[in-house]
Structure formats: C-alpha cells, structure tokens
C-alpha cells in the first residue's frame, strides 16, 4: 500500500499556525496506469495541469487514465498569486499541439477529457482557436469521448469565447477562484464581474450547455462571502460547482489563512445544492477537474 504523504505545495504560514491536518494528506502516486500516462505525456511533449499546478489528486486521476491537458504551453502571461504554473514570456503557439492531444486521448481510450490552458494575453484570441481545434480533433479521433474545457477569461474578448462555444464542448468551465473582496489582490489582472459575465454569456449563447465554476477557500474569505459567491453563480445559472482548500505553492505566493474543516465543506455543498446546483464537489482535496466525468450529466431540466 502506498504511503501517505503531505501535498507537494508548501505554505508560507507563520510558525505559530497549526500544522497541516491529516485530511490534507494523499497517497504517493504510482501504479501501472499512472506510469503509462506519465510516459505518454513525455513522448508527446504535452503538459498537464495535474503536474504544473501540483494537483493533490494526480495519483488517483492518472490511475484512472484521466488527465487535464494544459494547452498553449506551460508559461502563463499573468502572475496570479495563488498559481504554481510558470510565468513569463511564452513560446510561440504550437499549431500541432491539438493533433498530439487528440492522439493521446485516443491512445488512452478516454471517455472524458478535460482541456485547460495558461493565459495567453500575447495572442489576439487568447488561444481560443487552439481550444476549438483540439475539440474538433478529439471528436474525429475519439468520437465517444466527452470534452470539458476550463477556459481563461480571454481578457473579455467575447468573440474568443464564441470560438470555443462554436466547437460544442460538453462542459464549459470558468473558475471564479475567490470572493470579490480578495479578487484583485489574488488575481491582479482579472475582474470578478468579468468572470461572472463570461459565464452569463456562455449560458445565454448555449442554453443547453453544462456550465461550471469553482473556487478555493481558506485564503482569507469568510464563510458568508463564500455563500454570496454561490448565490452569484446561481444567478447566472451555473450548473456545477467545485470548492476546495487553497494551498500556497510557496513562500512567495499568497499565504494560506486557515484550513477549512470537512464539516464546513459539507455545509457549502448543502447550501449550493439547496440553491439549485445540479452537481457539487466540495472538500479539502477537491480541484476543478476532480470527478469531472460525473459533471457532464448535470444538464438543465
């Protein structure tokens, strides 16, 4: 049996803060499927957010032969204070990346694929055309595979959003990440209301589409503020919600304020379901793509 290990990320917490609780420990990744996915990603020169963002669920997901593909390289043009993905000047767009991703999806015989990306403010459409092309090629090479896209805000470029929507993903996800009071410090180059507008526009343009959002807690928000964000997301008819514990990637990042208890996560879930969400994942280790294959069935009725 694999040992229990602390999560990869390290918190920049004062020394008098409580140690990380037992519920934030995971099994060390391993197993034949895990190594098969790892090898394929290296062979195809592909990136996954599972690795780049130090996801605690990488062992579980890769052993189920699922992964979240990170499009548009692994260097982001923004500097969000919570994110472990590298920042700086990215390489030119790799026009062949969609073919390699689609081939990998087919090779792994995935029934559900998640596509996300770094922010690419250096290109006019923010990389939307790469999302669209990847969806189209997955449809060709793995027609039984459902596709979720976890998209950036495209800096408010709604034509870019339509480019992605026109490729007909099964689930459109855009994470709100945190509460309005912390938003500009947590995500200096983004706006809370712009993210809400993106989700509203997606719903208006494709009423049948499953829409999804997620946030992290334990970053300094109050529980009341979490409930208010849940309300705002329901106001724009988001179907699926994920809520997980924020873990700081290191000393230069936004610090963890506290560890939210499993009981509080359960209460967030209860409230969100009561408000009308079709599916809610709420727990310390939940990340945006956790159990994503279950979310595709959360269509409106």
From Swiss-Prot:
Catalyzed chemical reaction(s): [[Fe-S] cluster scaffold protein carrying a second [4Fe-4S](2+) cluster] + N(6)-octanoyl-L-lysyl-[protein] + 2 oxidized [2Fe-2S]-[ferredoxin] + 2 S-adenosyl-L-methionine + 4 H(+) = [[Fe-S] cluster scaffold protein] + N(6)-[(R)-dihydrolipoyl]-L-lysyl-[protein] + 4 Fe(3+) + 2 hydrogen sulfide + 2 5'-deoxyadenosine + 2 L-methionine + 2 reduced [2Fe-2S]-[ferredoxin]
GO cellular component: cytoplasm
EC number: 2.8.1.8
Keywords carried by this UniProt record: 4Fe-4S, Cytoplasm, Iron, Iron-sulfur, Metal-binding, S-adenosyl-L-methionine, Transferase
Entry binding sites for [4Fe-4S] cluster 1: 50, 55, 61, 289
Cofactor note (record): Binds 2 [4Fe-4S] clusters per subunit. One cluster is coordinated with 3 cysteines and an exchangeable S-adenosyl-L-methionine.
Enzyme class: transferase
Domain of life: Bacteria
Cofactor names: [4Fe-4S] cluster
The UniProt record lists the keyword Cytoplasm: yes
Main location: cytoplasm
Residue sites binding [4Fe-4S] cluster 2 per the record: 76, 80, 83
Gene3D superfamilies assigned to the protein according to its UniProt record, in alphabetical order: Aldolase class I
InterPro entries per UniProt: Aldolase_TIM (IPR013785), Elp3/MiaA/NifB-like_rSAM (IPR006638), LIAS_N (IPR031691), Lipoyl_synth (IPR003698), rSAM (IPR007197)
Annotated ranges, domain Radical SAM core: 62-278
Annotated localization: Cytoplasm
Xref: Pfam families: LIAS_N, Radical_SAM
Keyword Iron-sulfur: yes
Pathway(s) this gene product operates in, as recorded in its UniProt entry: Protein modification; protein lipoylation via endogenous pathway; protein N(6)-(lipoyl)lysine from octanoyl-[acyl-carrier-protein]: step 2/2
GO molecular function: 4 iron, 4 sulfur cluster binding; lipoate synthase activity; metal ion binding
PANTHER family registered for this protein in UniProt: LIPOYL SYNTHASE, LIPOYL SYNTHASE, MITOCHONDRIAL
NCBIfam families referenced in this protein's UniProt entry, alphabetically: lipA (TIGR00510), PRK05481.1 (NF004019), PRK12928.1 (NF009544)
Family: Belongs to the radical SAM superfamily. Lipoyl synthase family.
Name of the molecule in the record: Lipoyl synthase
Source organism phylogeny: Bacteria, Bacillati, Chloroflexota, Chloroflexia, Chloroflexales
């Amino acid at each position: 049996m694999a040992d229990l290990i602390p999560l990869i990320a390290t918190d920049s917490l004062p020394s008098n803060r409580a140690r990380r609780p037992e519920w934030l420990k995971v099994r060390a990744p391993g197993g034949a499927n895990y190594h098969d996915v790892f090898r394929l990603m290296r062979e195809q020169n592909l990136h996954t957010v599972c690795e780049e963002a130090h996801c605690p669920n990488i062992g579980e997901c890769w052993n189920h032969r699922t992964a979240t593909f990170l499009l548009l390289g692994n260097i982001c043009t923004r500097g969000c204070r919570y994110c472990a993905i590298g920042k700086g000047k990215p390489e030119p767009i790799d026009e062949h990346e969609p073919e390699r991703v689609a081939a990998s999806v087919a090779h792994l015989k995935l029934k559900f694929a998640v596509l996300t990306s770094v922010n690419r403010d250096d290109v006019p459409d923010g990389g939307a055309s790469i999302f669209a092309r990847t969806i189209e090629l997955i449809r060709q090479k793995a027609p039984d595979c459902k596709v979720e896209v976890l998209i950036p805000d495209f800096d408010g470029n709604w034509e870019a959003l339509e480019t992605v929507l026109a490729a007909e993903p099964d689930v459109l996800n855009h994470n709100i990440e945190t509460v309005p009071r912390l938003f500009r410090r947590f995500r200096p180059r983004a706006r809370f209301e712009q993210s809400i507008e993106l989700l509203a526009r997606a719903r208006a343009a494709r009423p049948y589409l499953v829409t999804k959002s997620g946030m992290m807690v334990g970053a300094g928000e109050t529980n009341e503020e979490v409930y208010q964000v849940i309300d705002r997301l329901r106001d724009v008819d988001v179907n699926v919600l994920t809520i997980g514990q924020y873990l700081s990637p290191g000393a230069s990042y936004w610090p963890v304020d506290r560890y939210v208890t499993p009981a509080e996560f359960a209460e967030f879930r209860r409230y969100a379901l009561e408000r009308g969400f079709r599916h809610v994942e709420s727990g310390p280790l939940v990340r945006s793509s956790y159990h994503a294959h279950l979310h595709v069935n959360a269509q409106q009725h």
